[in-house]
């Protein structure tokens, strides 16, 4: 049986969850349509998703049509959940990008299409809600050509009045884009030679798989218009990106989920081989796990299975698998261009509204951060505050609602702040000797630090011979330095520097790796005090698309948000602004753009790097360590 995995992507309220329901219903996978309004859909299964009518976590379901099984990935549509989208994209064989006939191409549509193009995923456009009043499809087509791609093939003729009717083209007009994109076909056509339908279909298929051409279909998921035809298109146009014939096992973990009973589930896309119940499988070329329970989606329901084949999405109950873990042979994993998840750039303090629920909150955050790499947390040992780092405002609203709905914990949040970093200002060296007070450890360590250009990261090397200081001691020094780099002089992570282990001494009978591990961060702090550090703040590169009439407003507002515009282009009555902006300003700048353009602007951002800040440094409380803080205090007192 052929197995394909497709994604359903769209801007908020374009109808992707409703489309999923219609595909399941028309294929016979379910006998009754779910409703977004009533909260009975198969994929939006959390209370918050049902209340807001939006998808937040990736939903997975399936249907079978003739000899093809189709796994549907119903992905989120809001910017703050793009991490969920990106993780899901890597397992797709193809995508359906929904566009509302009423709303046209929205900001989020462009962001999603940008990601699909970057990942090289074959994509079909589906114009949804064509039965609504006041639809002008020619305007929608032009919108798609200007904002997404001009390389579209309109596959159907649509009559909106008196009744909506969609029929597949049989005339030559659907082949214009295909012919124009191939010099040989165009020359043949211009010379008056006949073109066979087969060669046109082959050319279309090649360009579709190469993501240089996009078939376009129409319908209404809610009114069940064009859905049967879309099912045929899905099963015939998309190919499975799996290894043919016998091969070793290879699968990739793309989602972690916890059930209401706190069972931990790992979602895995299989790319080759066969996975059997009770198999022992190597994970990321390291430890092995035993498959004790295995599920997959069959006609919209999760069912236990005893084997799964290449192309399938399986769900294992396992406590150790991590996101992006590879089961089996890592060399068989498809080489697809990777989109980096955005980095958490904000942090805040969270506490339970009821102090007695603190342990419940920590347990809940452990589960949530396990399934969402964009949420991280730690507990400040001095203040006992719980510090969260995250991406955006809506993400925090969702986490707050999730804690209340699933874990029954209400929380209070402080105003978020940006996450900074530190870099040494100059070269410096420092040595702490064994048996010289106040050093209580049976170790001597000498370190040097040198600043590096921005974006270099932290580099470490040892000039101490392994013949003199064995590997276990050397590893302990490196571990201690990495720990020390987590908190610089202002309490932020230390980066863009080279740290060299230059001198070490031990006493054979009594010295242990723990002595070196404990002393290393103390030496590092002292050498950083000699060097001094400067504060770095995150900057984002941005590209803004806005209607041309808003050029002056967008340009003039930029300095107010510390944005630096480096390039301006005019294209199709649209202005494209490129530049960079501090991460602390992007949320407000983006919100204002959306407001004064009435939602007609889109702002694409990615982390550019860190720049030196000006003004007073922002400090963060250090996380204490009971084993070394007393020694730190003594050294700080004498230096």
From Swiss-Prot:
Keyword list, A-Z: Antibiotic resistance, GTP-binding, Nucleotide-binding, Protein biosynthesis, Transposable element
GO biological process terms, semicolon-separated: response to antibiotic; ribosome disassembly; translation
CDD domains in alphabetical order: Tet_C, Tet_II, Tet_III, Tet_like_IV, TetM_like
Domain of life: Bacteria
Location of the tr-type G domain: 1-242
InterPro entries tied to this protein: EF-G-like_DII, EFG_II, EFG_III/V, EFG_V-like, G_TR_CS, P-loop_NTPase, Ribosomal_Su5_D2-typ_SF, Ribsml_uS5_D2-typ_fold_subgr
Coiled-coil ranges per UniProt: none
PROSITE patterns: G_TR_1, G_TR_2
One example GO MF annotation: GTP binding
SMART domains: EFG_IV
Binding site for GTP: 10-17, 74-78, 128-131
Similarity comment: Belongs to the TRAFAC class translation factor GTPase superfamily. Classic translation factor GTPase family. TetM/TetO subfamily.
Matching NCBIfam families: small_GTP, tet_protect, tet_protect_M, tet_protect_M_W
Protein name per its UniProtKB record: Tetracycline resistance protein TetM from transposon TnFO1
